[in-house]
Amino acid sequence: MKLTINKNSAKWMQLPRDVLVGHGVLEEIGDVCRDLKMKGNALIVTGSTTNNIAGKRVSNLLESAGCSAEMVLTCKATKEEVEKVMEKALEVETNFLIGVGSGRSIDLAKLASTRLELPFISVPTAASHDGIASSRASIVDNGRSTSAQAQAPIAVIADTEIISAAPFRFLAAGCGDIISNYTAVLDWELASRLRNEYFGAYAAALSRMAARVIIECADSIKPEHETSARLVVKALVSNGVAMSIAGSSRPASGSEHMFSHALDKIAPKPALHGEQCGVGTIMMMYLHGGNWQEIREALKKIGAPVTAEELGIEDRYIIEALLHAHSIRPERYTILGSGLNPSAAEKVARITKVIN
């Protein structure tokens, strides 16, 4: 039998080479750098709060390991801040970057390192979303939140002692981001059937598995428990791997994420990304004809928001976000199709008890 090879089917997948999850693993950052042959000048990208939580420790540990460490403090995930990080990296002749934070700093390090063609290490201080290990970065450009393609971290060092000490709201938001995989994969399957879009069964299965684990363990995810932090971090890393395998954010981002991004634009005070995605998943699962009650119950058990009131967002903004969600990424086909009308948007929000 003759084997025919399609040369155009090759795909480049970037995955983290070292992933450390556990109590006190931050102390091993020097060993990770040696293992990955990373030496010379490191640039630590962090915020003022996360610098006190872990940034200064990372700097001291790197210097003890024979690396010099410079630091740049950031405040927002904007295009201008990416340029600021890049300028600092060039100024100090950086060999690699380290993002230390709950999301913003990691995304900035991710984008800056990608553009500079330098490796970067992800050191999350909270487990609030799957950006800690993915090849995607959320950035604000001209006042609009966008998802940009970048490189995956060469290593992830997730110290559960630090992560479990963060406000539990962040961990609960991370659970919402993971559970949203369910509707993301359903949207992906729909696009494959109706628009002949590429569908990766392996990436989809990995994504679904992460969501299923969180739902089945919802009762045991508690504040200040390192076992809870470890469980959520591993699922978030799985999300990042699934996206890298797929070559897009499809396994972990669908209509529920478009709803969240619409809320970011519309609501005066948006909630956390993962919180909004969790609520969006309840409604999008209803539209898919799936078990939205299971999603809602799991989020409630964890302590994540399931209503507009719990998000701190007025009902009218929920409806408006539902009406505009399909236009956030018009090239990405989802259950929202060409959009909901006002009556349908209100109906889904009321039936799923997101609004009263």
Curated annotation (Swiss-Prot):
Record's keyword terms, sorted: Cytoplasm, Lipid biosynthesis, Lipid metabolism, Metal-binding, NAD, NADP, Oxidoreductase, Phospholipid biosynthesis, Phospholipid metabolism, Zinc
GO terms, biological process: glycerophospholipid metabolic process; phospholipid biosynthetic process
Originating organism: Methanosarcina barkeri (strain Fusaro / DSM 804)
Family assignment from sequence similarity: Belongs to the glycerol-1-phosphate dehydrogenase family.
Superkingdom of source: Archaea
Residues the entry annotates as binding Zn(2+): 177, 257, 273
Location within or outside the cell: Cytoplasm
InterPro entries (alphabetical): G1P_dehydrogenase_arc, G1PDH, Glycerol_DH
Sites where the protein binds NAD(+): 103-107, 125-128, 134
Broad class of the protein's primary localization: cytoplasm
Binding of substrate, residues: 130, 177, 261
Pathway note: Membrane lipid metabolism; glycerophospholipid metabolism
A GO cellular component entry from the record: cytoplasm
Keyword Metal-binding recorded: yes
Protein name per UniProt: Glycerol-1-phosphate dehydrogenase [NAD(P)+]
Cofactor note text: Binds 1 zinc ion per subunit.
Primary gene name: egsA
Cofactor(s) the protein requires to work: Zn(2+)
